[in-house]
């Protein structure tokens, strides 16, 4: 088989080290990415219905790109910020 082997991207692009420079812990990274991926997924689901309750991707996307990959790129580029809730 000639040619170049496929390059896996997924969680390796963007690299975890770059993402951890933007957020304060790996736990907040997981929470932010999961919440944003759910928002992006809901946005795409609502497009066909004409409802635009959520904000779409803030970065250029490729066809068939996963919402989690989009969310991780948004975090790396500093387009998302996390606000901590103060205990009452």
Swiss-Prot record:
Pfam families: RNA_pol_Rpb6 (PF01192). It comes from the Bacteria. It catalyses: RNA(n) + a ribonucleoside 5'-triphosphate = RNA(n+1) + diphosphate. It is an enzyme of class 2 (transferase). Belongs to the RNA polymerase subunit omega family. Promotes RNA polymerase assembly. Latches the N- and C-terminal regions of the beta' subunit thereby facilitating its interaction with the beta and alpha subunits. The RNAP catalytic core consists of 2 alpha, 1 beta, 1 beta' and 1 omega subunit. When a sigma factor is associated with the core the holoenzyme is formed, which can initiate transcription. NCBIfam families: rpoZ. This is DNA-directed RNA polymerase subunit omega. It comes from Thermobifida fusca (strain YX).
